[in-house]
């Protein structure tokens, strides 16, 4: 099977959400879903808001990134999470 690399864009609910805590939570979530976190970064958006990007590496399987994406969307301080890039290695 091939290895999948995905870039997930995560939007926090507000500028008051602690950036470092959110990044740590996202990394832990990825690793608890049989995947590897290859990096977490943030970029300023506007008016104090920021976007968090999570690079995920996992083995190709049925359902793919859906369980991880759904778990990220279920987090309390996350407004939305979506896969913005996906490639096979």
UniProtKB/Swiss-Prot annotation:
List the Pfam families. EF1_GNE
SMART domains, per database record: EF1_GNE
Q: Which family does it belong to?
A: Belongs to the EF-1-beta/EF-1-delta family.
Q: Which residues form a coiled coil?
A: none
Looking up InterPro entries in the UniProt record yields: eEF-1beta-like_sf (IPR036219), EF1B_bsu/dsu_GNE (IPR014038), Transl_elong_EF1B/ribsomal_bS6 (IPR014717), Transl_elong_EF1B_B_arc (IPR004542)
Give the record's keywords alphabetically: Elongation factor, Protein biosynthesis
Q: Which GO terms describe its molecular function?
A: translation elongation factor activity
What is this protein identified as? Elongation factor 1-beta
User: Briefly, what is this protein's role?
Assistant: Promotes the exchange of GDP for GTP in EF-1-alpha/GDP, thus allowing the regeneration of EF-1-alpha/GTP that could then be used to form the ternary complex EF-1-alpha/GTP/AAtRNA.
Query: Which Gene3D superfamilies does the entry link to?
Result: 3.30.70.60
